[in-house]
């Protein structure tokens, strides 16, 4: 799957001093200079099987706690989405600047941080609802690109990444070509089938390990899939976690 950047606009309402609610979001309002020893990277990957407002709401609800943490501790954020076609990149979450909210007053800082995370969540909502969703596709391409995305951030001038969290929204119920190792068309729900599928992913190097980088799968079993599909997705998550990272859940 070829990565073709598609810059998205940040269209959100007027919190934290933005005068014109119809104007694009000025993401620099939520960014600070990173310390000399660097900052963590939050890499958000969105594998979208639909772009409904309901799905957008679920995605933003699950990602917002990670945005809260990033704004509290100071983190770079990079976001990549795919609905089965080309990759979409957010010009807000590009990974080149550290996001952080700091204030002299603790109560004010917490209030502004929560407000900022809600504003930034609307960028994610916008990306989900505007993403073109193909009838076929899987998370394989996004997982395959993790190391490249991390390296792209690390190679950015004046950016120093000291640890990585990869946040993956996916239902793990991809459909596509037979060559796609995570194509679950016609597959029964069993641990052995999930193990065979994931083993093939790594043997064919469609997916490779990210080593010690932290990986968190969200979105599994949160849609309208039936029980056998939910079981298969859960088994696939377990097998992927066993192979993709030493810190995965």
Which residues does each PLM region occupy?
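VWA/integrin I-like adhesion module and closely mimicked acidic/polar interface patches used
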Residues: 21-22, 173-230, 234
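Hydrophobic beta-strand segments of well-ordered beta-sheets in folded domains
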Residues: 36-44, 73-79, 164-166, 206-221, ...
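Catalytic metal-binding/acid-base residues of hydrolase active sites
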Residues: 49, 172-173
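Post-signal peptide N-terminal segment of mature Sec-exported envelope proteins
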Residues: 19-40, 44
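C-terminal motif of bacterial Sec signal peptides marking the signal peptidase cleavage site
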Residues: 6-9
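Von Willebrand factor
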Residues: 38-162, 165-167
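Bacterial signal peptide processing site
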Residues: 11-14
């Amino acid at each position: 799957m070829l990565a073709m950047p598609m810059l998205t606009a940040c269209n959100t309402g007027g919190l934290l001093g933005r005068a014109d609610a119809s104007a694009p979001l000025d993401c620099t309002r939520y960014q600070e200079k990173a310390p000399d020893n660097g900052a963590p990277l939050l890499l958000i990957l969105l594998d979208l099987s639909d772009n409904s407002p309901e799905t957008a709401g679920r995605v933003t609800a699950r990602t917002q706690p990670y945005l809260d943490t990033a704004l509290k501790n100071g983190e770079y954020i990079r976001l990549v989405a795919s609905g089965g076609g080309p990759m979409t990149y957010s010009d807000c979450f590009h990974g080149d600047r550290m996001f952080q909210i700091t204030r002299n007053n603790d109560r004010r800082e917490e209030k502004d941080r929560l407000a900022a995370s809600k504003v930034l969540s609307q960028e994610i909502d916008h990306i989900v609802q505007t993403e073109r969703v193909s009838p076929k596709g899987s998370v394989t391409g996004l997982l395959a690109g993790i190391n490249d995305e991390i390296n792209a951030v690390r190679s950015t001038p004046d950016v120093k990444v000291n640890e990585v969290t990869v946040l993956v929204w996916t239902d793990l119920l991809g459909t596509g070509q037979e060559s796609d190792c995570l194509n679950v068309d016609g597959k029964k729900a069993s641990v052995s089938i999930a193990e065979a599928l994931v083993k093939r992913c790594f043997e064919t190097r469609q997916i490779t390990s990210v080593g010690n980088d932290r990986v968190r799968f969200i979105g599994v079993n949160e849609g309208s899939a039936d029980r056998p599909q939910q079981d298969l997705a859960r088994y696939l998550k377990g097998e992927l976690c066993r192979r993709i990272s030493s810190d995965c859940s």
